[in-house]
UniProtKB/Swiss-Prot annotation:
Family matches, as NCBIfam families: folK
Subunit record text: Monomer.
Annotated pathway: Cofactor biosynthesis; tetrahydrofolate biosynthesis; 2-amino-4-hydroxy-6-hydroxymethyl-7,8-dihydropteridine diphosphate from 7,8-dihydroneopterin triphosphate: step 4/4
EC number: 2.7.6.3
GO molecular function, one term: 2-amino-4-hydroxy-6-hydroxymethyldihydropteridine diphosphokinase activity
Function in brief: Catalyzes the transfer of pyrophosphate from adenosine triphosphate (ATP) to 6-hydroxymethyl-7,8-dihydropterin, an enzymatic step in folate biosynthesis pathway.
Protein name: 2-amino-4-hydroxy-6-hydroxymethyldihydropteridine pyrophosphokinase
CDD domains the record matches: HPPK (cd00483)
Keywords tagged on the record: ATP-binding, Folate biosynthesis, Kinase, Nucleotide-binding, Transferase
Amino acid sequence: MITAYIALGSNLNTPVEQLHAALKAISQLSNTHLVTTSSFYKSKPLGPQDQPDYVNAVAKIETELSPLKLLDELQRIENEQGRVRLRRWGERTLDLDILLYGNEIIQNERLTIPHYDMHNREFVIVPLFEIASDLVLPNSQIITELVKQFADHKMIKLNP
């Protein structure tokens, strides 16, 4: 089995419930085991500011699904939970992104792993560090170094 990390985010239709439903759906994927999940964090939107705050988390899974099959399954879960893409970095009921898939580096028209720009996003790095404090990314970046830039993050840890 391959260890993968999934970022979860929502800012519409009761975001905490959206994340819980997504985690349940991920745990039910074939040949996949949900290992652990970070705390949930409330964060400001990355893009347009005329939208509600987000709730974000990171999940660690073990899977036998290929990266593209995992992507297909995550997009199916997004769609089942009412995901509509209206604008770039806009509001959404659910956003599921593959951050890491083993030590693989993948770049094609459908998928980029490690997830592009993840190292600059506090709502990814802080929860990822919480569940994988000894992680080394495929490009040799070390999570303990990446998280230092977010020592003064403004996210609020939730206890859902």
